[in-house]
Amino acid sequence: DVSFRLSGATSKKKVYFISNLRKALPNEKKLYDIPLVRSSXSGSK
């Protein structure tokens, strides 16, 4: 019973974690990718 309850909790946490990642990814890409591209472009030039 304990192992089953733990597996159920982890599966729910995984779904919740993935949903949060999907929500955060677009924002992180806009915040981090653009500055990285600008810095890398200016550094290469």
Swiss-Prot record:
It is an enzyme of class 3 (hydrolase). One of its GO terms (biological process) is negative regulation of translation. Keywords: Hydrolase, Plant defense, Protein synthesis inhibitor, Toxin. It catalyses: Endohydrolysis of the N-glycosidic bond at one specific adenosine on the 28S rRNA. One of its GO terms (molecular function) is rRNA N-glycosylase activity. Its EC number is 3.2.2.22. The keyword Secreted does not apply. InterPro entries: Ribosome-inact_prot_sf. It comes from the Eukaryota. Belongs to the ribosome-inactivating protein family. Type 1 RIP subfamily. Capable of inhibiting HIV-1 infection and replication. It inactivates eukaryotic 60S ribosomal subunits. This is Ribosome-inactivating protein TAP-29. It comes from Trichosanthes kirilowii (Chinese snake gourd).
